């Protein structure tokens, strides 16, 4: 057992809560297969997006939490539904008109529009695996195409035939009348075209292991359900997979919630035990719409990592998985700064129970690196970048070194990366939107007061003292709401509606530099 077992078993951190559910479902016993199986799924119709990363990151958090509670071995598989027929051509791929010729073909039977792999599905799988590998996930990759064709599901597919009536009785009430007339859990792969067919099944034979359907010419075609000659509809497929692989834990997006009962019931019909399940909320774009691989309306992994460290992305995934969150570029700075705060709290905290409840414990699976930024946040660096418009990070380091002589790019690589990220983010998202407020006569009086205050203070004056002095100037100016006062200052001095704590910012930027900035507006 882990040395933190006692704290972990009492913890309300959601990965430990989920891990306890799994342990309870097993009654503390090792499963017959010898390990606890965690499964994530991937639909490779379009390029993997950040939500795909999120599901795997969260799954590993639960897996590692379970390993703190139990000595039972674990395994994580990532299952790709790459045998699904193409239903819609993604808008963000090259040569979409070529792909459109292969509608209803299994994704692994469509030529690779990127020209790199043996099929479109193989390319998408490779993209998924490359970034899972990049972030150090330990997993086994399962391809639906390979599982069906290799016979891994054959026993279960025969059982679906044997339980055909029971499964139909479960499924049919969920459809409209016209769909009821044509539905079958089996989708034959057309021997002539290779397409995944959604056709009525005229006859099924459990002993022979076959289904029969009518082709367009009216001919009866009999095909085996085994060996990759048929694919299950996605709802029965989900439940069948749970039973076949003996999955112990699965998480899925809210779009699956309405069908989760069906997955579980089909798993039971096929003699399996449904896994413990977590339904997470979907990410929304800045307009409140669901992000989609095929639409390409989300932040990609590469997008996020262009502007921020991977830990900030992992924190975004950790926070409130059952609550809908908007995922767009504006959330990046906030998550970087929250990560810095959680990291510092973790290393200052002596109470082990509080440490294992800290998000960074789960992000780093218990091995939390210590970072030092000397109180400099990502937001502060963005504001520094905004006033000095640096060509490269060495300009920012000039200010950082004056603020904290101990800090260097070599001894503080995290801070060095933040400086680089801040310049990129500023150039791409802030620079073009800067809009300065022309100071009124009232504002000029305030600016003169700030200038006088800066002229009177000593270089060693603490940030809090500077902040209080600026606060007092706002009070003296008669603002009913000091938020309006600071907003005016940010608009006049930075060209932005929001900004930093000015005391800390002035310490970083330098009193003399700040005086020049204020003088420039007078």
Curated annotation (Swiss-Prot):
Short sequence motif 'HIGH' region: positions: 44-52
Cellular localisation: Cytoplasm
Pfam family, any one: tRNA-synt_1f
Gene Ontology BP, a term: lysyl-tRNA aminoacylation
GO terms, molecular function: ATP binding; lysine-tRNA ligase activity; tRNA binding
Similarity-based family: Belongs to the class-I aminoacyl-tRNA synthetase family.
Protein name: Lysine--tRNA ligase
